[in-house]
């Protein structure tokens, strides 16, 4: 298992997050602090963690721990990193892990489970987390950075692909831009 570290300026210096457009050391710490604050606003406690890895990944675990890999942090601008972290905060605040577990228990009790229904639920949660991030980013006056981050994270040949757990990037970006332009949550 990869070593998991709480983010700090010293750790960031150690792994060398000094690429040309990457978020600065101070801004990365600030974004992680903002994430904690947003969670507290919704009476949730969440903690961002940095995972030293050459993969590009951000995930929420048990609705309180947000993990983001060092290479993903290195690849994003400050505003794109904020958008990705706010998306993960959305999963925590909206209790997606608990909701999915409750759904799985109810369908297993009724013996009505299908993979497609489960995948639809997971994709719906992605849309909800995107909506949460977009709404939150509107208050920072930086709403367009979630689409930019999504396009950066996923290679162009996969933009139209719908994955079992995630909608296509094109569809997600279209929905986010609709939220940005029309407002609403």
Language-model regions, residue ranges each:
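A Zn2+-metalloprotease active-site environment signal
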Residues: 22-185
